Amino acid sequence: MFKVFIDGQEGTTGLRLAERLARRSDIKLLSIDSALRKNTQARLEKISQADVAFLCLPDAASKEIVEAAKDCPTKIIDTSTAFRCSDGWAYGFPELGHAYASAVANSPRIANPGCHATGSIAVLAPLVAAGLIPADGLYTLTSLTGYSGGGKKMIAEYENLHDPELDAPRLYGLNQKHKHLPEIAKYAKLTTAPIFLPIVAPYYSGMLVTAGFANTQGLPLAALRKLFADFYGKQPFIQVQTSEELPKMLGSNNLAGKDSL
């Protein structure tokens, strides 16, 4: 039985992760007494007992427990932004290539990609790798997300407040300093940060990311699809759709509750 501990299981990310892992018959979820949720020593003991520990914590709290667990051999997967661009941490996007997959398999420390970053990198990385778009180009990313991505506070606002402003999509990150921008640039291999437009909309879950770029080489749509299909191969969590599969409308909540792209 594979033992897993989730530090921060009471938060939105921790709860959804626990729901998924609870479906697995080969995984035992280690629990901690609610009175000890903020007790560093008690958490360290649970981390040490686990084969894998997930940290579903704010950045500062993740840094604190990682420092405390620096000598612990348990594989730690952090879901905050704290370590996504840090040396010594594997970036948890194995679909980007063999080097990433190998690092995820072998590293004791893994940084889980951000939600907006996942879709953005998934689109841009194959294009940059193929030389279809330049690394120093200026690209625009629009990412529409449901309100659950904002955690318990935002969920409560949307579900309990009666504010007319919440009835329409809202653009944020207007200063172009969104916390996902550094990892998007790093792992898409961009030398110029893209213009990033994140939008939260009045639906619970789901995301739709679009990337704008000039197809200066004039590749037909079929060739672009083949480029993505060849890059991702038979990855189980990424499907490259054919023209026959494309709907007339693409809903941003089509994959809500799923783990695939």
Identify what each model region corresponds to.
Residues A18, K179-T191:
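Short amphipathic alpha-helix segments
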Residues G212-L261:
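C-terminal active-site/capping subdomain that shapes the small-molecule cofactor and substrate pocket
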